[in-house]
Amino acid sequence: MTDSPFLELWQSRAVSVREQLGLGDRPNDSYCYNSAKNSTVLQGVTFGGIPTVLLIDVSCFLFLILVFSIIRRRFWDYGRIALVSEADSEPRFQRLSSTSSSGQQDFENELGCCPWLTAIFRLHDDQILEWCGEDAIHYLSFQRHIIFLLVVVSFLSLCVILPVNLSGDLLDKDPYSFGRTTIANLQTDNDLLWLHTIFAVIYLFLTVGFMRHHTQSIKYKEENLVRRTLFITGLPRDARKETVESHFRDAYPTCEVVDVQLCYNVAKLIYLCKERKKTEKSLTYYTNLQVKTGQRTLINPKPCGQFCCCEVQGCEWEDAISYYTRMKDRLLERITEEERHVQDQPLGMAFVTFQEKSMATYILKDFNACKCQSLQCKGEPQPSSHSRELYTSKWTVTFAADPEDICWKNLSIQGLRWWLQWLGINFTLFLGLFFLTTPSIILSTMDKFNVTKPIHALNNPIISQFFPTLLLWSFSALLPSIVYYSTLLESHWTKSGENQIMMTKVYIFLIFMVLILPSLGLTSLDFFFRWLFDKTSSEASIRLECVFLPDQGAFFVNYVIASAFIGNGMELLRLPGLILYTFRMIMAKTAADRRNVKQNQAFQYEFGAMYAWMLCVFTVIMAYSITCPIIAPFGLIYILLKHMVDRHNLYFIYLPAKLEKGIHFAAVNQALAAPILCLFWLYFFSFLRLGMKAPATLFTFLVVLLTILVCLAHTCFGYFKHLSPLNYKTEEPASDKGSEAEAHMPPPFTPYVPRILNGLASERTALSPQQQQQQTYGAIHNISGTIPGQCLAQSATGSVAAAPQEA
């Protein structure tokens, strides 16, 4: 059969590209080894050093478990900080104070020396749902589906792909050679290479199927209040609550407004209220201690006064009750003064709650409708007598997010200020990570100074595989922390938006650092761009030859092993948190302050960062599951241990988070990138080893191209929705009548006010019973109105989109 002119042209072009890259008919493996003769990364050690690395990592894991067991029982309840956290800091503690506290004692006392270890297996999803929230259930369900997927992938990789690779005879017959287990062991004319591409397609469909089953199992419960509340930006800063209510009554007479809350800058007031609360707890602690002992306690409140062993001038001791009483009075004065200033700091935003969801939906559609007039398209909502005064044409209207999802202190940062801050942070982050993307650059720098030369002759797997993979894991844990904290500094309006952007940034960064650049033999983004665009570089001709080096897969197998044992062990120990916790306990000036530190040490679980970390390792596993099938069972071990550690941490360590469903669906989309990268890896292998004209290369290329086209069509144009794994269920309230009755009932507290300020409002109401009947969500004559630091926490993208419009 005569080849078509198109294929001949394509082949000639492919040959020229391969020649430009310095690739011959067959890669020169010895050259790759010789080019790194002074390096500690690529060495032909026994079976890639995997047995030695596995033994060391398992030993380290057992040691970390032992250390954590000791610390958990001896050091300030470090292993159960969520259980001893402040009882009224989160709604779950209020809800479970009478039912779950005894259950916690059962876990601590009934199970022997390591109750936390067996508690991981005894915990039921109902307990986790009640204690940790539905987001934790969705997260753990996602992990379970990944576990079942990897069980199937491991079975197919070990029972089908591995024997096929071992049947080749291209590499050494040594049974201790790791390269015999990889795809590099097959001859270029072996028809079994087709099997790898077919199984890669099967893995793609398996991933879509498992993810679709996961999203179908999600029953997302929408809060009644959130579904009836709209968030409005673009209000004049001098707008009044009564004017906004009148506008909706006149423009939408069929829609009944239940409440309107204007937004104010209450960041400082929130801080003062938290400090006052800590002071009151310390005062109560020493008051109760005096009642119990009959003696007044002396403290040294000066900086580092707890280290003073004797009383000298400037380091005098004073009565604890008198000190905290004085601090409480001072904070109350500052709070009262700040309350007066709050009314002068409106944010131009408001929450509007309606009687029914249909009313809120109708108004939202009216504001977002696009009415085209000639060549100009603009939306004009229904007018009222206050439309001109309120500039309704400039409003941006969206559904409100859950009040627990709002980052209250960030609401005052909006518009141009928010964008400038975002650009500055991310530009600085990019510059910093441009040259320090991977730990490989550290190894290269060490090699330049001949640091590794004395141990080069040892050819020890501990040196050549354990330390590089441990270093890779260490940097993959450290450097994303920089991305994590940079996201916190961006001042997002919602925790959901913060977590989703954090997940995307950390995931992309980790994939480059852990998978793409090490696979290409590159050391940082600097070298990546030089290799990509600098055609005259002498380094460009040697990079791609080392992509599918026989022992290259061993490096990633060892990385997965390190993540499974050392990574999960360190995540259980949480060494940075332990260091911070220890430092805060040492620096606490009094016993009451140490009690406050213990009760305020727990933080919300960062689903964004945890999703990104787990999906990075999952992507590495899937990307090499065909070319290096040995990685699959170790990946399964990683996910199993990760699931156990996360169950423990969610229940005992972290506070619950209330996020939007978008964070969980974004994780599903990122999981689909793993089998697609596996197809890319097979295509690169076929292109480099077989050539573009090879049937297996053409078939793999067509599959990759078709997959990309389907993804683009679904993402950009909404096609192939039946193929999408995103198919979740929304639970409706049991009774609409109950919802209507609930809408007319006065809530126990103002929903769109920070919890700490809401408690202050309750105190004022208790002190002034005559005002209780007059209290409304947006009133500015009481604390809930003076501090309505309410600002809708939009969805991840919505909050960012609305922010610049407030400039």
Curated annotation (Swiss-Prot):
Catalytic reaction equation(s): Ca(2+)(in) = Ca(2+)(out)
One biological process term in Gene Ontology: surfactant secretion
UniProt region (Gating helix), positions on chain: 555-586
Extracellular membrane side: 1-51, 168-191, 445-462, 533-554, 625-628, 690-694
Spans within the Cytoplasmic topological domain: 75-134, 218-416, 491-495, 587-606, 652-661, 710-807
Membrane topology qualifier: Multi-pass membrane protein
One example GO MF annotation: nucleic acid binding
Subcellular location: Lysosome membrane; Early endosome membrane; Cell membrane
UniProt PTM comment: N-Glycosylated.
Residues recorded with modification Phosphoserine: S739
Entry's transmembrane regions: 52-74, 135-167, 192-217, 417-444, 463-490, 496-532, 555-586, 607-624, 629-651, 662-689, 695-709
GO cellular component: early endosome membrane; lysosomal membrane; plasma membrane
InterPro entries per UniProt: Csc1-like, CSC1/OSCA1-like_7TM, CSC1/OSCA1-like_cyt, Csc1/OSCA1-like_N, Nucleotide-bd_a/b_plait_sf, RBD_domain_sf
Stretches for region Intracellular linker IL2: 219-414
Keywords: Calcium, Cell membrane, Endosome, Glycoprotein, Ion channel, Ion transport, Lysosome, Membrane, Phosphoprotein, Transmembrane, Transmembrane helix, Transport
Presence of the UniProt keyword Phosphoprotein in the record: yes
Claim: Acyltransferase is one of the keywords in the record: no
List of glycosylated residues: N38, N450
Family: Belongs to the CSC1 (TC 1.A.17) family.
Subunit organization: Monomer.
PANTHER family on file: CSC1-LIKE PROTEIN 1 (PTHR13018:SF24), PROBABLE MEMBRANE PROTEIN DUF221-RELATED (PTHR13018)
Physiological role: Mechanosensitive cation channel with low conductance and high activation threshold. In contrast to TMEM63B, does not show phospholipid scramblase activity. Acts as a regulator of lysosomal morphology by mediating lysosomal mechanosensitivity. Important for the baby's first breath and respiration throughout life. Upon lung inflation conducts cation currents in alveolar type 1 and 2 cells triggering lamellar body exocytosis and surfactant secretion into airspace. Also acts as an osmosensitive cation channel preferentially activated by hypotonic stress.
Protein name in UniProt: Mechanosensitive cation channel TMEM63A
